[in-house]
Every structure is written in structure tokens, then in C-alpha cells.
Amino acid sequence: MKFLIKSLAVATISILGCLQTALAEEAKTESLTDKAVKHEKLGVKIESANHLFAEKYPLQYDSWKSTAKSTDRGSALEADPRYVILWAGYAFAKDYNKPRGHFYAVTDVRDILRTGAPKDENDGPQPMACWTCKGPDVPRLIEEKGERGYFDPKWAKYGAEIVNSIGCADCHDTTSEEFKQGKPALRVARPHVLRALNTVGWKFEDLDKHGKRPAVCANCHVEYYFKNKTDVTFPWDKGVDVDSIEKYYDEINFTDWTHALSKAPMLKTQHPDFEVWSQGTHGKNGVTCIDCHMPKVKDKDGKVYTDHKIGNPFDQFEATCKTCHEQSKETLEKRVKEYKHEVKEAMIRLEDQLVKAHFEAKAAWEAGATQEEMKEILMAIRHAQWRWDYSAAGHGNHFHAPDVMLRTIATGIDRAADARAKLGVVLAKHGVTTPVAIPDISTKEKAQLAIGLDIPKEQAAKDEFLKTVVPQWEKEARAKGLLPAEEADKPVAAPKAEAK
């Protein structure tokens, strides 16, 4: 008996010793979030070349590559020329296209007039931050160069390095054993994203798989700004709703640009999809981006996999909506179309008020208005347009949270009306008693002419850039193995949807 007790005691001490050692080792191991908060390198390995995963994961890769089929990138400025006036003085007034597949993220940011036509690595209007959402080469470069080494240069500095469009390593730890075994191995490797998630209580390492799914989408589908004109930063310190972010920007006196007509200190919303989703019925009930946009499907042989052709849930209704909803596809589609119509109709009303406010403010300045007279008016314009852009810039906001969007737009209309009422008083005071004339802005070209843009000149410079600089970037990238030696498209079979 004494021997047994002694043996148990020794075993217990050994187990406790091992446990203490394990706990001590765990305490020494900092999470990626902990490192990001301290602005340290994450110490991770990132394989960013998408083509390297085509052979091992053909179903996922081919479905991802099928986003190349979304070839239409129609101009949002042509569809609604009011945008040109709302963004007068900002690069978005030059060129702003409708969204298309992840496959084109790098191509589209190269092609867009907003990034200019740099002739060398120190030329051009934009910082490196403009690459930050575009692909897995970004977290690789941040890890290699450090945040300062990545964010400080001009956009053209690493054009030959950022060549893989949004892909595998943006969401997965592609070098891990877990990933090699065919498991998701979800990971966020952009330090600024880890910091932002941590700010709103979403420390990535503490999330379960359902939390990690939308968190990886928050790599890009979020509102952000360029702190110190270079660093991508999420304005979530006070919350993610429209009022909290507005308050954050106001308190730090942040301005994206000064409006060319009204001189208002403007904010440009990016794409607050994560923020709006989190406020809607799906977000509140734990239905994530993946559930609706990346369902489980079957290939022709019956093998189940996650479809990486991110698209409209109605395209795979049985595998998406039908897993929760009893209604027919036709019923739900009709409801979503109604949401879209209601939100779009309200949005256009706000746009019309803002266009008039910008031109009326311009007239007030020309009539002799003072800074003191215009101060409250300009802030009302700023807040009204922030609410419009928060609603307009997202992808599918009318579906993700239609009630939030309608409320946001309604408060925007209130602020625009307040600005215009006060402008009427100021204009009258300075002798302007007739309605301010609004030029013909019925087309994109006419609207751009009204604000003095020379688009043919900008397009000619861009065409030269695409013909001379970009091919050199791609040549260098292929030499480094970041792109395959040659690419050949192969047919992609459409997946068969399957209910979960």
C-alpha cells in the first residue's frame, strides 16, 4: 500500500510538473494579435502564390478561378453621374467601377484611373495602402518589410511584388500542417486587421470557427482610412455603426479631402460590409458570409467541398437560403428586390439634396460668405454625405440590413435639409435670392466637365502605364516565382448545389 501511495504521489507530481511546464510555455507564446497590438512582426510564413495550390486543391482553386467569369466592370459613374459631383476634388470622381470577382482585384486596381500612371517607384498619387486589400502578397510583404517598410513607400514601389489577386493565403494559413491535411486553417495575417478585431472584442485567436469565418472577410470588406495618409486603419474604437464611426472621425478631425465645390471637409466611405452585416438580422443570428456566399457543394463525382466562387446566394438557393428558410426562391427574391428598390430610391433622394447643397455652398462662397457663416453648414454636408456613402459603398447593404440603411439614409436627408436651409439664409444675406443654377450633369462626361476634369489626358497616361510598366512588373514577378511561367485557362465545371 505504501508503495502504491508513493507511486501515485510521484505520478501526480510528474503530471503537475508537466502541466506547469506546458502552462509556462503557453504563457511565453504570444498570439498574432498580441504581436500586432505591439506593432511587432507576426513571425509567420506566408506562401502567397495562388497557383501553387491548384494541384492539391483543384475543386477550391477552380471555383475561385471561375470568378474570372465576372468580366463586366461597368462604370458606376455612368450609371449615376451624381457620384461625380459628390466626389468632386477626389480621385473617385475620375473612375469608379461596379464590383466584380476576386480574380480581378489586382488587375482592377492597376487599371483604375485613381491610381494614376506612375513612371517609377517614387512616382504617382497613391500610397502603398491602396494595395492592402488586393491579395496575399500584401501580408507577405508586411511580414518581410515590417509595417513601416510596407506602408511608407508610394503605390508603385512594390508593383512587381503584389501580383496575386485575392486568394488562398488571404484567409488560410497555407503553410500549416492543418491546411496540408485539407482543413480550413483560417488565419488573419494583416496586423492592422488583428488590431481592429481586437478593438471590438473579436480577438481572432479566441473566436470559434463561426466567428473566424466573417473575421477573415473583414480583411477587406470593411470601412477604413489612411492614418497619417499612409497607414490602413479601421475606425472602430467607438463602434461600427454609422454614428460611432462618424464621432470617431470628428474627434480626431480626420478628413479624406476638401470638396472642390462646397469646400466641406469630406469623408469617403470604403465598403463597410462587415459593419453593416453585424447590425443586420443575419449577423445578429450568427449567419455568416460563408453560409450565404461560399456554400458546401458537390462536384460531378459527389465530392463535397466549399465553393470559392463567391457570388449571389440565390444562384445556389438550395445550399444557401433553403438551409434556413421555408419560403420559395421566388418569394425571397421578390422581398430582396423590394428592399433594394426602397433603399435605392431613398439613396437617390439624398444624392439629389447633396448635389444641390454642394453647388449652393459654392455659390455662397462666391457671394462672399464667411468661414463662420459656413462652418455648421459644411459639417452638415459632411455628415449627410457620410451617411449616404456608408449606405452606397457596401456590397448588398440593402439585403444585409435594410432597416439600418433606411434609418441611415433618413438621418442623412435630415442633415442635408439642415444644410440647405441654412444655405438659403446665408445666400439671401449676401444678395442671392434666386435658386442656384445646377449645370447639366446627366452623363458622366458632362458631370466631369462641370468640375473641370480632363479624363482623356488621364486615360492616355494610364494606357501608357499599362503598356509599359505593368508588363515589366509581371515579368519580374514570374522570374521570382510569384506567378506561373505561363497561364492557360481551362474550362471550369459549374458546381451542383447541395443542401447542408
Swiss-Prot record:
Residues where heme c 2 binds: C168, C171, H172, H308
Residues engaged in binding Ca(2+): E223, Y224, K268, Q270
Cofactor binding, per record: Binds 1 Ca(2+) ion per monomer.
EC number: 1.7.2.2
Catalytic activity: 6 Fe(III)-[cytochrome c] + NH4(+) + 2 H2O = 6 Fe(II)-[cytochrome c] + nitrite + 8 H(+)
Keyword match Oxidoreductase: yes
Residues annotated as binding heme c 5: H282, C321, C324, H325
Disordered, as annotated region: 477-500
Gene Ontology molecular function terms on file: calcium ion binding; heme binding; iron ion binding; nitrite reductase (cytochrome, ammonia-forming) activity
Residues annotated as binding substrate: Y224, H271
Annotated Gene Ontology cellular component terms: outer membrane-bounded periplasmic space
GO biological process, one term: nitrate assimilation
Cofactor(s) listed in the protein's UniProt record: Ca(2+); heme c
Residues annotated to bind heme c 3: H102, C217, C220, H221
Pathway assigned in UniProt: Nitrogen metabolism; nitrate reduction (assimilation)
Binding site for heme c 4: C289, C292, H293, H400
Subcellular location: Periplasm
Domain of life: Bacteria
InterPro entries: Cyt_c552 (IPR003321), Cyt_c_NO2Rdtase_formate-dep (IPR017570), Multihaem_cyt_sf (IPR036280)
NCBIfam families: cyto_c552_HCOOH, PRK11125.1
Function: Catalyzes the reduction of nitrite to ammonia, consuming six electrons in the process.
Family: Belongs to the cytochrome c-552 family.
Identification of the protein by name: Cytochrome c-552
Species this chain originates from: Mannheimia haemolytica
Gene: nrfA
